[in-house]
Amino acid sequence: MQKLAELYRGKAKTVYTTEDPDLLVLEFRNDTSAGDGARIEQFDRKGMVNNKFNHFIMSKLEEAGIPTQMVSLLSDNEVLVKKLEMVPVECVVRNRAAGSLVKRLGIEEGIELNPPLFDLFLKNDAMHDPMVNESYCKTFGWVNEENLARMKELSYKANDVLSKLFGDAGLILVDFKLEFGLFKGEVVLGDEFSPDGSRLWDKETLNKMDKDRFRQSLGGLIEAYEEVAHRIGVKLD
């Protein structure tokens, strides 16, 4: 499938149209950002690692009955996906306290959250992705109640599948972000799942194996991503 015009350029991915109006090409770049794009650096192999990582995870979720936009892997850094009507709200599932939750509530990083928390954030970089709730979604018409309930259901189902996948590989799935859209009226998982949008810690050492290595200037970003990929069985080369 040939990519045509650039449709959208995000912080780490570029979306292209194709000759099929229902399909898009998603290109993973080497860019890495923090602070809503205020800080951007490039890392060799990152686009390839995240593309193959994402394809692997989406395939696992499809196998578990979670509909995704994934169609096929095109190249090291490109994937063919369904064109979704994206919901402007992202879902976050939290198994342990980290990131904005720690800052917001003043709680200790790493404490277990049982049951896991489900948060909603409006996708708006200029406003720093403000936290919202189901009432906001209804009032502002971002997503209807039925589809939001389905998004929540699929988010928790993904958490069950992925917590086991990473757990079996000696990793803790601390939290993660999911974005959904509609394809022919059906709620479908879109965007990506990679260490860019999740927190993954080593079970024994609690070493951070995700984008916090970049956010917190810990170093070894790509090495950590590749280690996680290797542990769960992603074929990178």
From Swiss-Prot:
A Pfam family: SAICAR_synt
EC number: 6.3.2.6
Name of this protein: Phosphoribosylaminoimidazole-succinocarboxamide synthase
GO biological process: 'de novo' IMP biosynthetic process; cobalamin biosynthetic process
Reaction it catalyzes: 5-amino-1-(5-phospho-D-ribosyl)imidazole-4-carboxylate + L-aspartate + ATP = (2S)-2-[5-amino-1-(5-phospho-beta-D-ribosyl)imidazole-4-carboxamido]succinate + ADP + phosphate + 2 H(+)
Enzyme class, UniProt record, top EC level: ligase
Presence of keyword Nucleotide-binding: yes
UniProt GO MF annotations: ATP binding; phosphoribosylaminoimidazolesuccinocarboxamide synthase activity
GO cellular component, one term: cytosol
Family classification: Belongs to the SAICAR synthetase family.
NCBIfam families for the chain: purC (TIGR00081)
Keyword Ligase in record: yes
Pathway named in the protein's UniProt entry: Purine metabolism; IMP biosynthesis via de novo pathway; 5-amino-1-(5-phospho-D-ribosyl)imidazole-4-carboxamide from 5-amino-1-(5-phospho-D-ribosyl)imidazole-4-carboxylate: step 1/2
Keywords in alphabetical order: ATP-binding, Ligase, Nucleotide-binding, Purine biosynthesis
